[in-house]
């Protein structure tokens, strides 16, 4: 059986993923990015540390490791454990092929909290000579350009690296699928409209559904034909108004 995830040791699993993503890097555009979601597992009373093992192995293989993002789950799966905390997060790693890459931070800006907005309104502003000009409310035109983390027009801020996303079961699959809301920022920030999103582990097609919803194209690779057969239904579940698929190909080997 060639399916990844059935290896005898963590090192074998890590090595297989490195090989897969080496091929991904080969065909990726020079300004492309890789967004990798990984959970962890236990064995013999020890946490394997799979996400970071994979991240460092990919970095050693030539990828630029740009950021770790925490997927915080408000509704994690219960665990019958009494000697540690219940696991309620996974990792998403942002990696790139080159030092400079496509990343649309404007597309995924998030709302500021009310306390942030009130604090912003009370802050003193400085003109280009370093002299105070009153609060933002009193001197809106003189707002310092350096305060780029807060946009005065709509009070948006750069997206933070902890994403709280509720897990959502998908009845069409008997295996775990990540929620569309989790990967939406990855696609919006990492791929322009009309671009192509590649998922080497296509599964039920969640990535394709989100990509098509946001006017991107998608290529899925899936070893298991049973999973591949779910793609049409999953796309309709995510994007009910789709008339025709921009899905380029589903590779079954």
How should each PLM-predicted stretch be described?
Residues 1-238, 247:
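Core catalytic lobe of class I
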Residues 242-253:
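Acidic, low-complexity intrinsically disordered tails
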């Amino acid at each position: 059986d060639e399916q990844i995830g059935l290896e005898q040791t963590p090192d074998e699993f890590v090595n297989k993923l490195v090989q897969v993503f080496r091929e991904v890097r080969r065909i990726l555009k020079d300004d492309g990015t890789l967004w990798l979601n990984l959970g962890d597992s236990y064995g013999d009373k020890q946490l394997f540390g799979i996400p970071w093992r994979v991240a460092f192995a990919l970095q050693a293989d030539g990828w630029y490791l740009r950021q770790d993002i925490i997927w915080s789950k408000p509704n994690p799966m219960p665990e019958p454990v009494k000697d540690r905390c219940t696991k309620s997060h996974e990792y998403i790693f942002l990696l790139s092929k080159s030092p400079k890459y496509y990343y649309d931070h404007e597309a995924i800006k998030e709302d500021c909290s009310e306390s942030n907005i009130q604090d912003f309104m009370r802050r003193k502003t400085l003109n280009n000579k370093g002299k105070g000009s009153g609060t933002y409310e009193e001197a809106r035109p003189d707002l310092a350009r350096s305060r780029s983390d807060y946009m005065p027009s709509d009070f948006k801020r750069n997206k933070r690296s902890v994403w709280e996303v509720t897990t959502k079961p998908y009845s069409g699959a008997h295996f775990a699928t990540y929620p569309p809301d989790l990967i939406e920022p990855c696609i919006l920030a990492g791929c322009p409209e009309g671009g192509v999103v590649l998922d080497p582990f296509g599964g039920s097609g969640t990535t394709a559904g989100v990509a098509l919803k946001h006017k991107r194209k998608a290529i899925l690779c899936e070893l298991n034909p049973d999973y591949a057969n779910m793609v049409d239904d999953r796309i309709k579940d995510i994007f009910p108004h789709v008339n025709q698929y921009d899905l380029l190909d589903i590779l079954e080997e």
